[in-house]
């Protein structure tokens, strides 16, 4: 059994008893913030209730769990199969149990992946053990660390390194960058928000001929350095979002990178003239220009990029003029035109884009007549119409979009009576009806949409009577009802929505501790907001069963921060964010 594990290739699926497939040497947990909210794969498996029939951790999982608990007893794990060591390492990172001292046990373990992004206390003293993996090391993430030039220098022995992520780090200089110039096998390199990446420093990249993905998002000093990328002919993805220093001349420098299929230049100082340099990038599949200083004139150049499947032109000062250029982009799957001065006249030119799966028209001057041009978008899954002039007459044009999964009608003119026209959209999973004119009658009209997992009724006027309709939405994972019309009686209708992980009932000022008693049964909750209510400290006892709760907001209530802290300490170990604090 152990020999079989040892022979597995990187990221090879393993079929265990019962037909369960998992991937060895993958990252079981990725943190999205420094608070490390992610839960570990092994912990969730091993700590399953022993009374649940049919659930039994594998011998390998039990062994790994045991080693993790006793990690301080081991001076070296180098005799273990590489994949087992990798899984132990991943588990310690995910549970935030890895320390500088316990890391030493992984010296010379031939680890392939060291993912320490935003992990606390990582500095140069960790790098010797990390780099002892030598030529086995393929991927390193040191984002948010205190690793300096000296630490980066040790990577020179990791000659097979394919991916290096060093985001949000302020302790490296241009001199330190030179240490990666010899890592000729690098395919992915990320230095988000780094002041060390200057035009001069970018010469380091010129020797990385195998580079396929480069991420320099929010790097403020890179203008003029794009000339050093000219020889990177294998480059497929370039991200320089939010680099205000990037101008048209920088795009001219990369106009010969004809293998590019993804270009992220949102919120850069790019004009229509700069976009003209992109016309030769015929393999470009994804282009993000959100927030650039372009106008409808740029559509002439964009129309030459016929392979585009993803195009983001949000906040680009577009008008109807020139929108006829969209008609030739028939491969588009995702088109974002939000926050532009386009009207129904623009939508006429989108009519033939029948491959569209997602369309964003947020805050555009779109009305009912314009929606008639969307009726043929049978592949549409996501439609954003928030803050438009769409009303009841326009909704009928959406009735044939049977594949629609996400629809945002917040702050539109849609009324209760028109919501009946959505009854056939049974694939809907997310619906936003945040509008004051929506009432109990509107909620009753959509009870057939039983696949809904996300329902936003934030500003809708839903009363206790209307809340009775919520019992039809058994699959709801997130729910917002903040119109002020709910009392404890209405909250009782939530008791069977056991899939809820995110619940916002703020602004319902008549809710009392009795509501918390009902909510105590919603044990999957991760986030709960009942601000502006009559909840008291006495009611906090009902939250004790909510072991998964990570965020609790009870502002403008009768609850004190000290009592929430007591609750956190006694019963809610996963609670990391609460208000009042």
What residue ranges belong to the model's regions?
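Amphipathic alpha-helical protein-protein interaction segments
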Residues: 49-57, 74, 78, 145, ...
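Short, solvent-exposed loop/turn at the beta-strand->alpha-helix junction
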Residues: 94-100, 120-125, 145-152, 170-175, ...
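Compact recognition or signaling/catalytic modules
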Residues: 184-193, 198-199, 206-249, 255-320, ...
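Leucine-rich solenoid repeat scaffolds
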Residues: 539-581
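Conserved hydrophobic beta-strand positions in leucine-rich repeat
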Residues: 112-117, 138-142, 162-167, 186-192, ...
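Cullin-RING E3 adaptor/co-adaptor recruitment helices
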Residues: 2-128, 132-139
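Leucine-rich repeat
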Residues: 133-134, 157-159, 180-186, 194, ...
């Amino acid at each position: 059994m152990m020999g079989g594990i040892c022979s597995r290739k990187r990221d090879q699926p393993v079929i265990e008893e019962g037909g369960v497939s998992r991937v060895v040497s993958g990252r079981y947990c990725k943190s999205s913030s420094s608070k490390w909210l992610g839960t570990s794969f092994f912990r969730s498996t091993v700590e399953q209730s022993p009374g649940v029939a049919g659930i039994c951790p594998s011998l390998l999982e039990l062994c790994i769990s045991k080693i993790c608990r006793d990690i301080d007893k081991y001076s070296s794990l180098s005799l273990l199969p590489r994949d087992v060591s990798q899984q132990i390492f991943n588990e310690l990172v995910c549970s935030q149990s890895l320390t500088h001292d316990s890391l030493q046990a992984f010296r010379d373990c031939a680890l392939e992946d060291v993912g320490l992004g935003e992990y606390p206390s990582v500095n140069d003293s960790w790098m010797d053990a990390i780099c002892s993996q030598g030529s086995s090391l393929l991927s390193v993430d040191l984002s948010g660390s205190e690793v300096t030039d000296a630490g980066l220098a040790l990577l020179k022995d990791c000659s097979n390194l394919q991916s290096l992520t060093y985001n949000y780090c302020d302790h490296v200089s241009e001199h330190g960058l030179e240490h990666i110039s010899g890592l000729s096998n690098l395919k992915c390199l990320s230095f988000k928000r780094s002041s060390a990446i200057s035009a001069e420093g970018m010469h380091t990249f010129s020797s990385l001929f195998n580079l396929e993905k480069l991420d320099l998002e929010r790097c403020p000093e890179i203008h003029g350095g794009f000339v050093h990328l000219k020889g990177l002919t294998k480059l497929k993805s370039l991200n320089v979002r939010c680099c205000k220093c990037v101008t048209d001349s920088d795009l001219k420098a990369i106009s010969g990178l004809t293998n590019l299929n993804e270009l992220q230049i949102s919120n850069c100082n790019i004009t229509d003239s700069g976009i003209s340099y992109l016309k030769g990038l015929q393999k470009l599949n994804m282009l993000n220009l959100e927030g650039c200083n372009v106008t409808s004139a740029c559509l002439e150049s964009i129309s030459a990029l016929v392979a585009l499947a993803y195009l983001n032109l949000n906040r680009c000062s577009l008008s109807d003029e020139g929108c006829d250029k969209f008609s030739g982009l028939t491969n588009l799957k995702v088109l974002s035109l939000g926050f532009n001065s386009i009207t129904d006249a623009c939508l006429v030119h989108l009519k033939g884009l029948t491959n569209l799966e997602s369309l964003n028209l947020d805050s555009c001057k779109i009305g009912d007549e314009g929606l008639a041009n969307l009726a043929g978008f049978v592949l549409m899954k996501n439609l954003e119409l928030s803050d438009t002039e769409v009303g009841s007459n326009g909704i009928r044009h959406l009735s044939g979009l049977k594949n629609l999964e996400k629809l945002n009608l917040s702050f539109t003119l849609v009324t209760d009576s028109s919501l009946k026209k959505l009854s056939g959209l049974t694939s809907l999973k997310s619906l936003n009806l945040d509008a004051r004119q929506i009432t109990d009658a509107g909620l009753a009209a959509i009870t057939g949409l039983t696949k809904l997992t996300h329902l936003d009724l934030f500003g809708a006027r839903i009363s206790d009577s209307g809340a009775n309709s919520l019992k039809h939405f058994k699959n709801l994972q997130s729910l917002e009802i903040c119109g002020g019309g709910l009392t404890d009686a209405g909250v009782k209708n939530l008791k069977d929505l056991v899939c809820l992980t995110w619940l916002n009932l703020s602004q319902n000022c008549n809710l009392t501790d009795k509501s918390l008693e009902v909510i105590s049964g919603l044990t999957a909750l991760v986030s709960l907001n009942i601000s502006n209510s009559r909840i008291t400290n006495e009611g906090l006892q009902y939250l004790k069963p909510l072991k998964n709760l990570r965020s609790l907001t009870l502002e403008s209530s009768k609850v004190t921060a000290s009592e929430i802290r007591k609750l956190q300490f006694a019963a809610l170990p996963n609670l990391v964010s609460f208000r009042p604090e």
